[in-house]
Amino acid sequence: YTLSLHDALPILGIFVANQQSIEGAMIQMLSHGIVSAALFLCVGVIYDRAHTRDIKFYGGLVNRMPHYAVAFMIFMLASVGLPGTSGFVGEFLIILGAFKFNTSLAFFAATGIILTAVYMLYLYKRIIFGIITNEKLKNILDLNRREKAIIIPLIIVVILMGIFPNIFLEP
């Protein structure tokens, strides 16, 4: 469902058709591509170790996989649009452009963003914190060098896009 909102926001930005919303749509599409790929990569990491996608079997991963927990947190926060990450820039510009066009439209879009943030943060809490109940997770290993070599550049891009968005907007 979060992917649906992140697909709808750039469409809103394109149809509002002012400079802020168009720039926001471009950044949001780029950010969404990177962050979604990173989140799927994070899911793949724990699936590779536990061989289940069922969320109820996860919990307490921060105790066994602290590097994974940090990487997953960064991508999750970028997905919900935390300032300083790539997700914030696109969402902010789209909402700003939508607000200039129609305040009600901007309000509904912002409400969707907030509801998505609640869902994503609950998901993060459920997977990362708590106690380990699945026996397969008792000896689970943290990120290896190969996984870090893939994840760290994605983290750098997500943060660079959030701090220096003009790099991606200037011709």
Say what each PLM segment does.
Residues 4-141, 161:
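Functional transmembrane alpha-helices
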